[in-house]
From Swiss-Prot:
Residues bound to 3-methyl-2-oxobutanoate: 43-44, 82, 112
One MF annotation (Gene Ontology) recorded for this entry: 3-methyl-2-oxobutanoate hydroxymethyltransferase activity
GO terms, biological process: pantothenate biosynthetic process
Annotated source species: Geobacillus kaustophilus (strain HTA426)
Protein function: Catalyzes the reversible reaction in which hydroxymethyl group from 5,10-methylenetetrahydrofolate is transferred onto alpha-ketoisovalerate to form ketopantoate.
Protein name, per record: 3-methyl-2-oxobutanoate hydroxymethyltransferase
SUPFAM superfamilies: Phosphoenolpyruvate/pyruvate domain
Cofactor(s) for this UniProt protein: Mg(2+)
S-S pairs: none
PANTHER family with a match to the protein in the record: 3-METHYL-2-OXOBUTANOATE HYDROXYMETHYLTRANSFERASE
Pathway in which this enzyme or protein is active: Cofactor biosynthesis; (R)-pantothenate biosynthesis; (R)-pantoate from 3-methyl-2-oxobutanoate: step 1/2
Family named by the database record: Belongs to the PanB family.
Iron is among the record's keywords: no
Length: 279
């Protein structure tokens, strides 16, 4: 398993870091087999897996439950788990308690928090307590209501400078990496140049230190709207629906199960049970 120091070395060597989300055992197992460097158990599971309209309803218990499954599927991959909405805002004590639960109960290697300003103090407190923290700036889904929807952030000089300053504060507070979402490619490149920690982009251009995408988005699985920054490498949803429809048809036509899928009893046992009569 890679350690957090390995990601610093990858940045220094110019080797892109590959991160993908996973929310359950099979997806984590496949991600590890594919050779990803990091897995993010994102609170996006609220929308992707649990069917919520946003990430807001997701709880610490949800994150622990899903991370435990991911750890079982990917025992040798560095796992980052989101701290969900309002689990690190009320007080440092509450943030520490929730982070402790995630780290101890789920098997995560690090936690991720969104935003800057007052969150920077939480990053510092968690780091001081020995919890590795990944920061998340740009489009932060937990704050989408405040941001006015799912929009590109940092498009003008003033807001871009604010994001760059925020990133530097997160780094100074002890963050081990930064997820940068939905910003102009120029800002992504500047962040990667000016920060010593790895900058992992999602819609932040190609010149950052790594990329992260949502598992279901890149595989075309259960998604209705694909963000501009997503490249779909497959469309397994169509394959799944076709397979299920074929199963339905076969059962309705009594074409499944076939002899190859059934079990038989020895004739003498059948005679002993029913006297040779059909049951």
């Amino acid at each position: 398993m890679k350690a957090k120091t390995d990601f610093f070395h990858m940045k220094q060597a110019g080797e892109p870091i590959v991160m993908v989300t996973a929310y359950d055992f099979p997806s984590a197992k496949l991600a590890e087999q594919a050779g990803v460097d990091m897995i993010l158990v994102g609170d996006s599971l609220g929308m992707v897996v649990l069917g919520y309209d946003s990430t807001i309803p997701v709880t610490v218990d949800d994150m622990i439950h899903h991370t435990k499954a991911v750890r079982r599927g990917a025992p040798n991959t560095f796992i980052v788990t989101d701290m969900p909405f309002m689990s690190y805002h009320a007080s440092k004590e509450e943030a520490l308690q929730n982070a402790r639960r995630i780290m101890q109960e789920s098997g995560a290697n690090a936690v991720k928090v969104e935003g800057a300003d007052e969150v920077v103090d939480m990053i510092a407190a968690l780091t001081k307590a020995g919890v590795p923290v990944v920061a998340h700036l740009g489009l932060t889904p937990q704050s989408v209501g405040v941001l006015g929807g799912y929009k590109v952030q940092g498009k003008d000089a003033e807001s871009a400078k604010k994001l760059l300053d925020d990133a530097k504060q997160c780094e100074q507070a002890g963050a081990i990496a930064l997820v940068l979402e939905c910003v102009p490619k120029q800002l992504g490149a500047a962040m990667a140049r000016e920060l010593t920690i790895p900058v992992i982009g999602i819609g932040a251009g190609a010149e950052v230190d790594g990329q992260v995408l949502v598992y279901h988005d890149l595989l075309g699985y259960g998604v209705t709207r694909v963000p501009k920054f997503v490249k779909q490498y497959a469309s397994i949803q169509e394959t799944i629906v076709e397979a299920l429809a074929n199963y339905v048809a076969d059962v309705k036509l009594r074409q499944f199960p076939e002899p190859a899928h059934t079990f038989t009893m020895k004739e003498e046992e059948w005679v002993a049970l029913y006297g040779g009569k059909q049951g």
